[in-house]
Amino acid sequence: MSKEELISMMRKFKDAFNKKDLEKTLSFFAEDADWVNPNGKFKGKEEIKNYFKWVFEINPDQKIIDSGVKIIAEEDKAVYEHILEGSFEGMKYQILALCIYESKGSKFQHLRSTFDRLSMAKQLAKGPIAKTAVNTIINRMEKGLK
């Protein structure tokens, strides 16, 4: 697959994801694909499908938005810098995400994603106990930084 074809496939994947089109979103993955992200490790199309169902259910308005360097591709590998934006239980969030895509043939074979769950927790913490817990963790991690 050429660099241009990989970028095109990633953009089509983003569009399907943003439309919450489960079957179309899943169609970009090889049968034995794997995806590692802060929510877990998902091996095979069935586990990836269950992950998408869960994401679409708890984050019905989550969108992938281009950010920063966007997509940098080389042969069968690409890195994508983007923002995940949505809401959870009525509270809005926006977090930076980085994904590494590796293709095999015309499908995604390996996907590794990272995003800051603590930043998301800070934006979504509800009530004094949750806010205190999240801020305590953040303050401990940033001790001596400022």
Where in this protein do the model-derived segments appear?
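Hydrophobic pocket/interface hotspot
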Residues: 13, 25-26, 33, 44, ...
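Short beta-strand edge/turn micro-motifs at domain boundaries
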Residues: 96-128, 132
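Short beta-strand segments enriched in hydrophobic/aromatic residues
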Residues: 29, 82-86, 99, 115
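Hydrophobic/aromatic beta-strand elements that line small-molecule binding cavities or substrate pockets
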Residues: 52, 66-71, 84, 96-102
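A short hydrophobic beta-strand element
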Residues: 74-84
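Short, low-complexity N-terminal intrinsically disordered segments enriched in polar/charged residues
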Residues: 1-28, 131-146
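Short, cysteine-centered beta-strand-loop-beta hairpins and adjacent loop/turn segments enriched
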Residues: 58-61, 85-94
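A solvent-exposed, acidic/Ser-Thr-rich amphipathic alpha-helical stretch
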Residues: 22-27, 31-75
